[in-house]
């Protein structure tokens, strides 16, 4: 993860996701927080979203609100919409005030995705309760 070539660092991040497991999250979160290259951080945010563990939420929240790159904030917001949670929704509501339009648009999409998942979940529960 400390290789001088950003392409190698990006691939290493993606490979960690391929190996899977929640124990990989701290390594990817460190890349998201500390890598100098915004493309590498963007891929780390994407990767955390793909993993969909609740433990990915804190680093994604931090990046959505604080990363200096609009490119990374946008991807972290989208990833929060994939993972979903009360905390994710609160953060995405804050991201609606981001100065960069792509981040705001990503927050809108992410919130819509969370709402859809919540509706789907409620429908599944209703179907189970009613035998439908």
Write out the residue ranges for each language-model feature.
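Amphipathic alpha-helical scaffolding segments comprising HEAT/armadillo-like alpha-solenoid repeats
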Residues: 2, 21-33, 53-65, 85-97, ...
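Structural detector for internal amphipathic alpha-helices that build alpha-solenoid repeat scaffolds
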Residues: 6-21, 30, 39-53, 62, ...
């Amino acid at each position: 993860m400390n290789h001088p070539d950003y392409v190698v660092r990006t691939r290493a991040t993606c490979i960690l996701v391929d190996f899977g497991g929640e124990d990989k999250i701290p390594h990817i979160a460190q890349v998201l927080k500390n890598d100098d290259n915004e493309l590498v951080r963007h891929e780390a945010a994407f990767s955390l979203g793909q993993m969909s563990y609740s433990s990915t939420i804190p680093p994604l929240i931090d990046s959505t609100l604080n990363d200096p790159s609009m490119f990374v904030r946008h991807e972290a917001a989208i990833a929060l919409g994939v993972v979903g949670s009360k905390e994710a929704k609160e953060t995405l509501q804050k991201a609606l005030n981001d100065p960069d339009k792509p981040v705001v648009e990503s927050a809108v999409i992410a919130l819509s995705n969370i709402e859809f998942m919540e509706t789907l979940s409620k429908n599944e529960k209703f179907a189970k309760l009613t035998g439908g």
